[in-house]
Amino acid sequence: MAYENLLVEKRDGIAFVTFNRPKVLNALNRKTVGELREALLDARDDSAVRVLILTGGGEKSFVAGADIGELAQQTPVNGKEFSLFGQSVFHLLETIGKPSICAINGFCLGGGCELALSCTIRIASKTAKLGQPEVKLGIIPGYGGSQRLARLCGKGVAHELCLTGEMITAEEAQRIGLVNRIYEPAELLPAAEAMAKKIIANAPLAVKYTMEAIERGTQMPLEEGLFLEATLFGLSCATDDMREGTKAFLEKRAAAFKGK
């Protein structure tokens, strides 16, 4: 599929999704979010894709928030629909069953930060700036920021970032657990690709079940989450990959996983 606002490349088991509106700092409009939905569905249905890497085109920005011109046209009715549509796409990213690595290469604000929060893992360049500045525009986060940020970093952090609207540095984002690692700008994408390859080397079903245990389990009471983990552990024990993995370990060789 041809995209107007995205660049999508698939190689070596990785789908690279680059937001490509550098003149507006890769701001999200409805068309871009719709194209992201199509790219995610394509990656989900492509068995050759094991990991997604999301980043921004240009040197200044990952995604600098919503397209303000489009945002200014929202009414109470279509504003709610606008929010629900974006939430559905970001939820798809979160539940696609394949890990996503967000390589934050600059401004990561508003909808961009909400997009990053929907990814499995977040890494950033030293030049990155993150934040939820919606209150400065008279609105609140609409693509899940108030919920995912509070769940990831705690209510205190979410309140501070969402109520002040201030940007934070990559170092501060790492300190509060919003990003995992920080790299020099030139090292960011190679680091994301190296991480993706480490994931790809592992058993596909085990990766999928692990993500499910973490994503679903942390939304449950502990006892229910532990039961889910035990259920998924049992399912993993029924796979050919489990037999191959244990056999390869005992034979001191690399495992050849097939996702079965």
Segments and roles (model prediction):
Residues 1-3, 247-260:
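Terminal low-complexity tails and localization/encapsulation signals of metabolic enzymes
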Residues 89-95, 103, 109-163, 176, ...:
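CoA-thioester-processing core
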Residues 166-172:
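Acidic, divalent-metal-coordinating active-site segment for phosphoryl/phosphodiester hydrolysis
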Residues 22, 123-128, 179-227, 234-235, ...:
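C-terminal long alpha-helix characteristic of the crotonase
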Residues 1-55, 77, 84, 91:
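Conserved CoA-thioester-binding segment of acyl-CoA-metabolizing enzymes
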Residues 41, 56-92, 108, 221:
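Glycine- (often His-adjacent) and acidic-residue-rich active-site loop
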